[in-house]
Design a protein with these regions (language model features):
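Active-site groove signature of glycoside hydrolases
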Residues: 114-132
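Acidic (Asp/Glu)-rich catalytic clusters
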Residues: 73-84, 114-118, 168-172
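Acidic-and-aromatic substrate-binding clefts and catalytic sites of carbohydrate-active enzymes
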Residues: 60-69, 92-93, 131-135, 183-187
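N-terminal binding-site loop/beta-alpha segment at the start of enzyme catalytic domains
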Residues: 1-83
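A short acidic, helix-capping loop that chelates divalent metal ions and anchors anionic groups
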Residues: 25-30, 92-98, 214, 289
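Beta/alpha (TIM)-barrel catalytic core signal, keyed to glycine-rich beta->alpha loops juxtaposed to Asp/Glu
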Residues: 3, 130-314
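A short, structured active-site edge motif that brings together acidic residues
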Residues: 82-94
Length: 314
């Protein structure tokens, strides 16, 4: 699989990145720690991803309250291979525990992440959220210090809006921004993508299927499937439950059928066609869910085709 460099660094990531946020939990939500994929299921997914040429894995200290990093570390040790590793910090690892991007906390959290992963350094370390209590000078200084002592190779930010990213850029330039972006979530088109282009920052979106909405999983006047994002964490997607969205999704499914691909493949193809997208983070719940992402690498869209799909969703 093709790899691409991040920002101005020598770190490369595969065009499809394996998101490990469902290993041992559902993202960073404490109420779901211990749920999500079991270790056995996570191993199946990582085996499948590695076998398909996905060589970059994305996790975070708070995913599953540390369980995700632990599973990734055990898989690395058992398989004798080392994928490119991205991890993050900000969120608490227990209910009511500390959080944030203070220098001492980041150093402590990185040390524990390295221990769980069983490695001496990670390729990319991300601020998982913006911390209003930490100055840009402190944050950039912390990251640069970790690079200097070879605990990380590059750094970046996640879930930063345009204003937050702009304030950071007055002090330092991250190698990568990792935000939610899809045909149904285009907020980053209002500033973030422009800043990334202007400063040579790579962009690796997560949530390419908008919690399953772009796969056709959710139907009008029908209960949401058990175990789906809308069943477990509906908040980020509740605004999509309207007739306008369903009508656009109907047309999107028709276009996918005409092209002979799964809607998930078309959704990821659209992202890969965007000139500002370096790689796409996908978080499968089962190994077979990797197949639409791999198919998207071969299903290339022209600029006009990508623009037509974007117009479907405003």
């Amino acid at each position: 699989m093709e790899s691409r460099p991040l920002g101005g660094t020598d770190v490369e990531v595969s065009r499809i990145i394996l998101g490990c946020g469902n290993f041992g939990g559902i993202g960073s939500a404490p109420e779901f720690f211990g749920q999500g994929e079991s270790e056995e299921e996570a191993f199946w997914i990582m085996d499948a991803a590695w076998g398909l040429g996905i060589t970059t894995f994305d996790t975070a200290d708070a995913y599953g309250g540390g369980r995700s990093e632990t599973m990734v570390g055990k898989w690395i040790a058992s398989r004798g291979v080392t994928p490119g590793l991205i991890t993050k910090t900000f969120n608490p690892m227990e209910t009511g525990a500390d959080h944030g991007l203070a220098r001492t906390r980041m150093a402590r959290q990185l040390e524990s992440s390295l221990e769980r992963l069983g490695v001496d350094r990670v390729d990319v370390y991300l601020a998982h959220e913006f911390d209003p209590d930490v100055s840009a000078n402190e944050l950039v200084g912390t990251f640069e210090g970790l690079v200097a002592i070879s605990l990380i190779r590059a750094w970046g930010v996640s879930n930063f809006d345009a204003e937050q990213l702009r304030s950071l850029l007055e002090t330092g330039t991250p190698a990568v921004v990792q935000n939610s972006y899809s045909l149904l979530d285009r907020a980053d088109e209002r500033g973030v993508l422009e800043l990334c282009a202007a400063f040579g920052i790579s962009y690796t979106p997560f949530g390419p299927l908008a919690g399953g909405w772009l796969t056709g999983k959710y139907k009008r006047d029908a209960p949401v499937p058990e175990g789906s994002r809308m069943a477990m964490r509906p908040g980020p997607y509740e605004h999509l439950r309207n007739e306008e969205t369903f009508a656009s999704l109907d047309r999107f499914a028709e276009i996918a059928a005409q092209r002979g691909v799964h809607p998930a493949t078309l959704a990821i193809s659209w992202l890969l066609a965007q000139p500002h997208v370096t790689a796409v983070v996908v978080g499968p719940r089962r190994p077979e869910q990797l197949e639409p992402a791999l198919a998207a690498l071969e299903h290339q869209l022209s600029q006009s085709e990508a623009e037509e799909l974007a117009a479907l969703f405003g």
